């Protein structure tokens, strides 16, 4: 079922206040709260979950990252999911983006992390070869419109020496990213991350069996992975897990006809807060914030859970 998404976007802008800098994330939270269940909502919901994983987190906690990067990463995911782009195409577009380089900032760091995050490869010997291919890519601080920002710069002296890497021959940096996005380990690694997101450390579920079943179906899109997972018997019947704040709070709000005030989202996901604040940062569930994504399991240490409980009890 389709909806007029533009209507809800205007409604969110008119109805709510947002922070000067944090608006890109607060706006997405408000939009997910306001919109009804629909195909549009499901596509945005998938993108939101992906931006909270190690796969696509914008990592706004880093000084090299801006809050606008969170909007860019989220909207690119939504757009490509709606275009029915494949997982490999989406991963490739993300890896070559400035937003990704603001998260992992040098050829050595970026290439190492791409192999670890998307392929589950932890071979130190491969890093110098990958960094050689990306030797002319760098993140530099430059002045744009009178303001200093971190910008991806691609130099005019690319690597010209072929290297054997990831089962193929790589010369330039884009060759490396193509090798990662086309590698046979990409889909199993992505599926594993998404399964961990929904099953956490649940000992009653055989996660590897679930991962194998999904991979055997040869999913080409994120829609295929999420649909397979959400309608699996393991998820519908067997899984027992603490719910993330948004999952619990938004659901309860709908059931009891509770409505958020104009400044609710402005303070719900704010970067600088005191220990007294009811805020996703204090529950360790901040959206699109952490360099390595949200914790796989909802944090239930004493302090984090106390803030979680306080947020649900006092804000609703």
Predicted features by range, described:
Residues 1-82, 98-103:
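N-terminal accessory alpha/beta regions
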Residues 31-37, 55-64, 73-80, 99-101, ...:
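Second-shell loop/turn segments in exported
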Residues 42-44, 83-90, 123-125, 186-192, ...:
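Loop/turn elements at helix/coil->beta-strand transitions in domains of secreted/extracellular proteins
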Residues 44, 48-59, 83, 93-100, ...:
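Glycine-rich, acidic and aromatic/proline-enriched surface loops and short helix-turn segments
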Residues 54, 183-316:
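Flexible, low-complexity segments enriched for small/polar residues
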Residues 59-66, 101-107, 141-149, 204-207, ...:
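Short, solvent-exposed loop/turn and secondary-structure capping segments
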Residues 84-142:
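Activity-critical C-terminal alpha-helical subdomain
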Residues 109-112, 118, 129-202:
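Nucleic-acid-contacting surfaces of polymerase cores and analogous helical-repeat interfaces
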